[in-house]
């Protein structure tokens, strides 16, 4: 009984910590289709500004216009979506566990987070500060494989976030797959930089682009391939010149490698 009370107390403390801050520096990673649908709906109603088709998305970008809801009369279903997203906003400390069981492992993965084996356990621990975030995501499956896919360390520098880790990415509006980067393959160790919030350019020469974001990263691919350990470079620019009309430009390169 004492152990149960201690466990309940610990869970209560974790819960309190996890909702203690809504301004933490972290990302919403691909893997939650419900969150993505809500984000796209809120963007349509003006509660989220800027591009929404590249994931991960900064939580600061997602929530920075939420204050507008106080002066808006929203349909009931939009209010529900707003509350769901707000409740998912991470706090300073977050600890989660999740178990997966699948009778058949999917050969192709969509946006939703799915197991890569029949049985899989995932644990997530996250610490968010005003300008830095440490996200540890550990997975163990029935093949006795352990990995840290989805883990990263990020630090904001002005309106940019520099990061290192194995980051899952989803570039494009597709729901089941994308033409560039998706979560179908495991993420590669990478180092990169991406924009935090999508404020438009102030200069008259580029202000026509509207809200914009960008990312560039460099990864090292695996050894077990025809050309071992090549360097993989990815770049993407998204901008919204007209409300709810988003343009995405992306480029990937594979360089070097051992022979």
Spell out what each predicted region is.
Residues 95-103, 136-140, 164-168, 214-220, ...:
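Transmembrane beta-barrel strands of outer-membrane/channel proteins
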Residues 190-259:
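Signature for the C-terminal beta-barrel architecture of outer-membrane proteins
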Residues 124-128, 153-156, 194-196, 238-240:
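Transmembrane beta-barrel domains of outer membrane proteins
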Residues 51-55, 84-95, 128-134, 159, ...:
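Short loop/turn motifs that connect adjacent beta-strands in outer-membrane beta-barrel proteins
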Residues 51-52, 107-114, 137-142, 179-182, ...:
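Outer-membrane beta-barrel domain signature
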Residues 24-112:
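N-terminal periplasmic/intermembrane-space "pro-region" immediately following the signal or transit peptide
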Residues 10-19:
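Bacterial N-terminal signal peptides
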Residues 113-121, 144-151, 156, 184-194, ...:
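Residues that define the transmembrane beta-barrel architecture of outer-membrane proteins
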């Amino acid at each position: 009984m004492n152990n149960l009370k201690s466990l309940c107390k610990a869970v209560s403390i974790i819960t309190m910590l996890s909702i203690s801050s809504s301004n933490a520096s972290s990302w919403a990673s691909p893997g939650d289709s419900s969150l993505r649908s809500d984000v796209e709906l809120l963007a349509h109603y003006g509660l989220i500004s800027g591009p929404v088709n590249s994931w991960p998305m900064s939580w600061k970008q997602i929530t920075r216009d939420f204050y507008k809801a106080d002066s808006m009369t929203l349909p009931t279903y939009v209010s529900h979506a707003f509350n769901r997203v707000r409740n998912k906003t991470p706090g300073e400390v977050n600890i989660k566990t999740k178990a997966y069981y699948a009778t058949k492992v999917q050969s192709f993965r969509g946006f939703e987070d799915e197991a890569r084996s029949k049985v899989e356990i995932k644990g997530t621990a996250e610490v968010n500060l005003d300008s830095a975030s440490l996200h540890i995501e550990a997975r163990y499956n029935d093949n006795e494989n352990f990995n840290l896919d989805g883990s990263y360390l990020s630090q904001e520098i002005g309106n940019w976030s520099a990061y290192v880790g194995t980051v899952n990415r989803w570039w494009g509006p597709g729901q089941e797959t994308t033409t560039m980067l998706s979560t179908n393959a495991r993420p590669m160790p990478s180092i990169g930089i991406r924009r935090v919030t999508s404020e438009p350019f102030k200069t008259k020469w580029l202000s026509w682009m509207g809200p914009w974001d960008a990312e560039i990263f460099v990864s090292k691919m695996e050894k077990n391939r025809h050309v071992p350990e090549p360097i993989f470079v990815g770049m993407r620019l998204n901008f919204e010149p007209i409300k709810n009309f988003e343009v995405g430009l992306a480029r990937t390169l594979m360089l070097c490698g051992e022979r």
